[in-house]
């Protein structure tokens, strides 16, 4: 080393002799040669990192020649000397920052791969380690050559010599992952992800190679080796790409990760899925989300949103395998999504819950239904925007009315209404023609910059809760009755009312159960009903509290008009009544008829009493349409049980309100 210390004229005589000694002793038995190389290899480590580039170049070139000669000898099974022999390349690549030397190391390794791939065994680990270090470089030529060689190994060498490379398979995948995470070369990133996807094919086509593989440091059951050595490294590295890269690359990584699951998941064992989803759920980990609000919002709106739908698809595709081991985790993840201050993610959470139920509900066990209904109940309870009724600007005084106060004031003790009233009201859906004239989309609210930051956050969170409430109402309606059925009923009811055609020849509503209604117990339906009515009563309380709505409006909670929850008020009641009426006409639920009738009469009485207190023309108009459809359905009901039990209980206020409405219509026509 002293001879090489001169910065201008280093003497390389001794280094040359060391190279010759290595060359002539290469034929010794492994035990002897390994001891010799232990000393010589350490010397090459130091010389290869010499600040004098000429010395380092000589050392690397000498190493290349020795390595080519050594690799020609091949390597017997269970030996690891190639790994020791090639380690100086790895050390030099890690420690030497000279672009010239690093480029030279990569070229030396590339030459070995191209000429000696068939003889390399344990040396693959060093090769991938060198390329892994090159993958994060900023020098385009280094990255390009390293990636080309890695791609050649992944597509050609693996195809021909897979058993010899299997020990380094996960190193290859890790190396490709590092290329994908180099933000300076986006094209290389995308191609690296494609190659990882290609590696999945080797695992699928050659599972026996993984089962047969053994090593001293491997204490894994043969049936799990294909997971530990094959599938897990691929999926784990894809998850690392998702967590480390910018949007376009991580989106591609996410897509490929779920493509692998969907394509090859049928070969996965149940406990493999548990390991896999521990990785997947890291995408939603609060501790791993970006700290900046803008980046966090982008992450939730794009990556979390994409992952959520993909998880739902995979869960549906492999429901039989996953329902026992992952249902609780998936429901918990959906619940987490609707709790975040991100409207898109909250909507997606409810939509995915709906998809999971509609696509798999026929296969649900009673226990699964209980868990699902409880999840919906939890979401409903935690997303009711109670602060809408209690918020006051700084310095304001006064106690706002609670939902219970409003409900108590409006609930009038009346004689029970005909059960047939339900039929009309339960057919009305928030997106039908009946409510098209409403300009009540609270999600279009504008929060002015004049509010301080905590109030902005509060208003934003309240708006998202309003969105979730509407989405959940729609989810329950779609889940229980199936979307197409409900929409068809709405159209038929409205058409009948508009034609004023009351004879039996009119189009009859189909009553076949296309949704999940027949799979839900009465107790589960009552749970959902309670959620709907709680949501309805809250919306009703808010809509009736003009003072609070005005306060929020002045604070900028909604832009051009007072905020309202008309859609939540009407759609929740319509869905609840739809459920009650269906149960009341279901012969298989006779044991629940008494409870259903009691609930029907209470709900209908409360609804009509509330309608009679309305003063807003648009508000009354919405309910007038509901009553109009109700009357149309009453005259079509032919169920003697319904008529006998309710004919004498028609509420006088209802008749009076209809007469008033008819009088107003007649007066307008006369004018």
Regions found by a protein language model. Name each.
Residues 286, 290, 379-382, 386, ...:
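Surface-exposed polar/charged interaction patches
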Residues 18, 33, 37, 82, ...:
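Aromatic/pi-system hotspot detector in well-structured domains
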Residues 7-25, 39-44, 56-69, 85-88, ...:
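HEAT-repeat alpha-solenoid elements in large eukaryotic scaffold proteins
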Residues 2-12, 28-31, 43-58, 73-76, ...:
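Short coil/turn segments at helix-helix junctions and helix-capping linkers
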Residues 1-9, 99-100, 209-222, 284-304, ...:
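Acidic, Ser/Thr- and Gly/Pro-rich intrinsically disordered linkers and low-complexity segments
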Residues 81-85, 128-131, 147-150, 169-172, ...:
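Short alpha-helical linear motifs
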Residues 499-671:
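Intrinsic low-complexity, polar/charged intrinsically disordered segments
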Residues 1-18, 437-453, 457-461, 465-486, ...:
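Extended repeat-based solenoid scaffolds, especially LRR ectodomains
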């Amino acid at each position: 080393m002293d001879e090489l210390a001169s910065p201008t004229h280093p003497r390389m005589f001794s280094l040359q002799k060391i190279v010759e000694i290595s060359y002539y002793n290469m034929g010794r038995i492994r035990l002897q040669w390994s001891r010799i190389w232990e000393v010589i290899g350490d010397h090459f480590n130091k010389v290869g990192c010499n600040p004098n580039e000429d010395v380092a170049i000589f050392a690397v070139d000498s190493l290349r020649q020795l390595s080519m000669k050594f690799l020609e000898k091949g390597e017997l099974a269970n030996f690891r000397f190639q790994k020791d022999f090639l380690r100086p390349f790895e050390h030099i690549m890690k420690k030497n920052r000279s672009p010239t030397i690093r480029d030279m190391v990569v070229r030396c390794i590339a030459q070995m791969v191209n000429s000696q791939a068939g003889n390399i065994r344990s040396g693959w680990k060093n090769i991938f380690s060198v390329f892994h270090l090159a993958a994060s470089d900023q020098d385009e030529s280094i990255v390009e050559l390293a990636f080309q060689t890695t791609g050649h190994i992944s597509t050609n060498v693996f195809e021909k010599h897979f058993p010899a490379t299997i020990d380094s398979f996960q190193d290859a995948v890790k190396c490709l992952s590092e290329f994908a995470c180099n933000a300076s070369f986006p094209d290389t990133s995308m191609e690296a992800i494609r190659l990882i996807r290609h590696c999945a094919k080797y695992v699928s086509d050659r599972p026996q190679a993984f089962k047969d593989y053994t090593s001293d440091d491997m204490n894994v059951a043969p049936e799990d080796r294909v997971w530990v050595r094959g599938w897990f490294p691929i999926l784990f590295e894809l998850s690392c790409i998702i967590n480390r890269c910018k949007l376009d690359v991580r989106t591609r990584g996410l897509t490929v990760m779920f493509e692998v699951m969907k394509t090859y998941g049928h070969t996965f064992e149940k406990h493999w899925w548990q390991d896999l989803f521990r990785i997947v759920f890291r995408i939603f980990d609060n501790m791993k989300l970006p700290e900046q609000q803008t980046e966090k919002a982008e992450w939730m709106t794009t990556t979390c949103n994409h992952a959520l739908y993909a998880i739902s698809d995979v869960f549906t595709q492999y429901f039989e395998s996953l329902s026992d081991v992952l249902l609780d985790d998936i429901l918990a993840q959906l619940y987490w999504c609707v709790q975040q201050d991100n409207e898109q993610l909250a909507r997606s959470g409810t939509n995915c819950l709906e998809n999971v139920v509609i696509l798999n509900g026929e296969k649900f066990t009673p226990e699964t239904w209980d868990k699902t209904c409880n999840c919906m109940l939890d979401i409903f309870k935690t997303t009711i925007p109670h602060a809408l009724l209690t918020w006051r600007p700084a310095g304001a005084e006064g106690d706002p009315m609670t939902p219970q106060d409003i409900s108590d004031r409006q609930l009038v003790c009346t004689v029970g209404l005909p059960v047939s009233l339900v039929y009309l009201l339960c057919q009305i859906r928030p997106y039908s023609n009946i409510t098209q004239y409403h300009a009540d989309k609270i999600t279009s609210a504008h929060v002015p910059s004049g509010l301080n930051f905590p109030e902005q956050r509060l208003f934003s969170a309240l708006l998202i809760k309003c969105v979730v409430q509407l989405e959940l109402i729609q989810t329950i309606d779609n889940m229980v009755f199936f979307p197409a059925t409900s929409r068809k009923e709405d159209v038929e009811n409205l058409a009948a009312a508009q034609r004023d055609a009351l004879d039996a020849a009119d189009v009859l509503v189909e009553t076949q159960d296309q949704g999940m209604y027949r799979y839900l117990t009465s107790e589960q339906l009552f749970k959902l009903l309670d959620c709907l009515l709680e949501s309805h009563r809250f919306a009703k309380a808010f809509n009736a509290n003009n003072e609070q709505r005005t306060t929020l409006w002045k604070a900028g909670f909604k832009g051009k008009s007072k905020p309202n929850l008309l859609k939540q008020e009407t759609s929740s009641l319509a869905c609840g009544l739809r459920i009650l009426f269906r149960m009341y006409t279901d012969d298989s639920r006779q044991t629940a008829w008494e409870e259903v009738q009691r609930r029907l009469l209470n709900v209908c009485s409360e609804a009509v009493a509330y309608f009679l207190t309305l003063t807003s023309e648009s508000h009354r108009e919405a309910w007038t349409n509901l009553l109009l459809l109700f009357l149309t359905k009453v005259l079509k009901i032919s169920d003697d049980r319904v008529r006998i039990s309710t004919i004498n209980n028609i509420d006088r206020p209802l008749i009076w309100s209809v007469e008033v409405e008819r009088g107003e219509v007649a007066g307008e026509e006369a004018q």
